[in-house]
Protein backbone atom coordinates (compact mmCIF):
# COMPACT_ATOMS: atom_id res chain seq x y z
CA UNK A 1 0.00 0.00 0.00
CA UNK A 2 1.23 3.50 -0.82
CA UNK A 3 0.62 6.37 1.56
CA UNK A 4 1.86 9.90 2.09
CA UNK A 5 1.99 9.31 5.85
CA UNK A 6 2.40 6.12 7.85
CA UNK A 7 1.63 6.48 11.55
CA UNK A 8 2.96 3.69 13.75
CA UNK A 9 0.79 3.19 16.81
CA UNK A 10 -2.94 3.76 17.23
CA UNK A 11 -2.81 5.33 20.66
CA UNK A 12 -4.09 8.82 21.38
CA UNK A 13 -1.15 10.64 19.74
CA UNK A 14 -1.08 8.30 16.75
CA UNK A 15 -4.81 8.60 16.07
CA UNK A 16 -4.73 12.37 16.46
CA UNK A 17 -1.73 12.67 14.14
CA UNK A 18 -3.36 10.42 11.54
CA UNK A 19 -6.66 12.29 11.74
CA UNK A 20 -5.07 15.70 11.24
CA UNK A 21 -2.85 14.51 8.38
CA UNK A 22 -5.81 12.85 6.66
CA UNK A 23 -8.01 15.90 7.10
CA UNK A 24 -5.23 17.96 5.49
CA UNK A 25 -5.49 15.84 2.36
CA UNK A 26 -2.74 13.30 2.96
CA UNK A 27 -3.18 9.59 2.24
CA UNK A 28 -2.64 8.08 5.68
CA UNK A 29 -2.21 4.56 6.96
CA UNK A 30 -2.36 3.94 10.71
CA UNK A 31 -0.60 0.74 11.77
CA UNK A 32 -0.91 -0.90 15.19
CA UNK A 33 0.09 -4.31 16.51
CA UNK A 34 -3.08 -4.62 18.58
CA UNK A 35 -6.35 -5.73 17.06
CA UNK A 36 -8.25 -3.40 19.38
CA UNK A 37 -7.07 0.20 19.21
CA UNK A 38 -6.78 2.64 22.07
CA UNK A 39 -6.06 0.15 24.86
CA UNK A 40 -4.04 2.65 26.90
CA UNK A 41 -6.76 5.26 26.40
CA UNK A 42 -9.34 2.72 27.56
CA UNK A 43 -7.59 2.19 30.89
CA UNK A 44 -6.32 5.73 31.49
CA UNK A 45 -7.80 7.67 34.35
CA UNK A 46 -9.37 4.55 35.81
CA UNK A 47 -11.37 4.02 32.62
CA UNK A 48 -12.51 7.65 32.42
CA UNK A 49 -9.56 8.97 30.39
CA UNK A 50 -7.56 11.93 31.64
CA UNK A 51 -7.79 13.52 28.18
CA UNK A 52 -5.98 16.82 28.76
CA UNK A 53 -4.65 19.21 31.35
CA UNK A 54 -5.66 22.86 31.23
CA UNK A 55 -2.33 23.88 32.76
CA UNK A 56 -0.09 22.35 30.08
CA UNK A 57 2.66 24.82 29.28
CA UNK A 58 6.06 24.65 27.56
CA UNK A 59 7.93 25.34 30.81
CA UNK A 60 6.47 22.13 32.28
CA UNK A 61 8.19 19.90 29.71
CA UNK A 62 11.80 18.77 29.48
CA UNK A 63 13.23 18.49 26.00
CA UNK A 64 16.49 18.76 24.12
CA UNK A 65 14.58 21.16 21.86
CA UNK A 66 12.44 23.48 24.00
CA UNK A 67 11.36 25.40 20.87
CA UNK A 68 9.48 22.32 19.67
CA UNK A 69 7.26 22.21 22.75
CA UNK A 70 6.61 25.97 22.61
CA UNK A 71 5.64 25.69 18.95
CA UNK A 72 3.49 22.58 19.40
CA UNK A 73 1.56 23.96 22.37
CA UNK A 74 1.09 27.33 20.69
CA UNK A 75 -0.44 25.66 17.63
CA UNK A 76 -2.67 23.20 19.44
CA UNK A 77 -3.63 24.01 23.00
CA UNK A 78 -5.58 21.94 25.53
CA UNK A 79 -8.49 24.30 24.78
CA UNK A 80 -8.48 23.14 21.15
CA UNK A 81 -8.95 19.53 22.22
CA UNK A 82 -11.56 20.55 24.75
CA UNK A 83 -13.51 22.28 21.95
CA UNK A 84 -13.47 19.00 20.00
CA UNK A 85 -14.66 17.09 23.07
CA UNK A 86 -17.52 19.56 23.42
CA UNK A 87 -18.42 19.25 19.69
CA UNK A 88 -18.84 15.52 20.29
CA UNK A 89 -20.96 16.31 23.35
CA UNK A 90 -18.75 14.36 25.70
CA UNK A 91 -19.46 15.30 29.30
CA UNK A 92 -16.36 15.96 31.37
CA UNK A 93 -15.17 17.30 34.69
CA UNK A 94 -12.03 18.77 36.19
CA UNK A 95 -10.70 16.45 38.83
CA UNK A 96 -7.52 18.01 40.17
CA UNK A 97 -5.20 20.83 39.04
CA UNK A 98 -6.61 21.16 35.53
CA UNK A 99 -6.86 17.42 34.83
CA UNK A 100 -9.94 16.79 32.68
CA UNK A 101 -11.74 13.44 32.70
CA UNK A 102 -14.78 12.03 30.91
CA UNK A 103 -17.87 11.81 33.11
CA UNK A 104 -18.68 8.60 31.28
CA UNK A 105 -16.19 6.16 29.76
CA UNK A 106 -12.84 6.53 28.01
CA UNK A 107 -14.58 4.77 25.10
CA UNK A 108 -16.07 8.17 24.22
CA UNK A 109 -12.60 9.60 23.52
CA UNK A 110 -11.65 6.53 21.49
CA UNK A 111 -14.81 6.94 19.43
CA UNK A 112 -14.06 10.66 18.94
CA UNK A 113 -10.58 9.84 17.64
CA UNK A 114 -11.91 7.07 15.37
CA UNK A 115 -14.45 9.46 13.86
CA UNK A 116 -11.80 12.10 13.32
CA UNK A 117 -9.69 9.47 11.52
CA UNK A 118 -12.69 8.48 9.41
CA UNK A 119 -13.20 12.15 8.49
CA UNK A 120 -9.63 12.08 7.17
CA UNK A 121 -10.14 8.79 5.26
CA UNK A 122 -7.40 7.14 7.33
CA UNK A 123 -6.70 3.52 6.38
CA UNK A 124 -6.36 1.15 9.36
CA UNK A 125 -3.97 -1.77 9.65
CA UNK A 126 -4.61 -3.33 13.05
CA UNK A 127 -3.13 -6.59 14.23
CA UNK A 128 -0.06 -5.68 12.17
CA UNK A 129 3.44 -5.78 13.61
CA UNK A 130 6.08 -3.50 12.12
CA UNK A 131 9.22 -5.51 11.42
CA UNK A 132 11.41 -2.60 10.31
CA UNK A 133 11.38 0.85 8.75
CA UNK A 134 13.74 1.48 5.86
CA UNK A 135 14.83 4.89 4.51
CA UNK A 136 14.71 4.97 0.71
CA UNK A 137 15.16 7.80 -1.79
CA UNK A 138 11.41 8.37 -2.11
CA UNK A 139 10.79 8.39 1.65
CA UNK A 140 10.39 5.35 3.86
CA UNK A 141 9.31 1.74 3.48
CA UNK A 142 7.49 0.20 6.42
CA UNK A 143 7.96 -3.56 6.48
CA UNK A 144 5.39 -5.50 8.46
CA UNK A 145 5.43 -9.06 9.70
CA UNK A 146 2.99 -9.82 6.86
CA UNK A 147 5.47 -8.72 4.12
Predicted segments — roles?
Residues 1-3, 143-147:
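Core beta-strand elements of the Rossmann-like FAD/NAD(P) dinucleotide-binding domain
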Residues 3-30:
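N-terminal Rossmann-like FAD-binding beta1-loop-alpha1 element of flavoenzymes
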Residues 69-77, 96-115, 125:
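Short beta-strand to alpha-helix junction loop
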Residues 46-96:
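Glycine-rich active-site loop/strand segments that organize a redox cofactor
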Residues 126-139:
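A conserved short coil-to-beta-strand element within the FAD-binding core of flavoproteins
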Residues 14-16, 37-40:
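Short N-terminal binding/cap micro-motifs at the start of the first secondary-structure element
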Amino acid sequence: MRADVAVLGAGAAGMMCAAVAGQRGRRVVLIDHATRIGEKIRISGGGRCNFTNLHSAPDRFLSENPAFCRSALARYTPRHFLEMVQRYRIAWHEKHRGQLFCDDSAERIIELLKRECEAGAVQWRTGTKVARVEKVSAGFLVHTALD
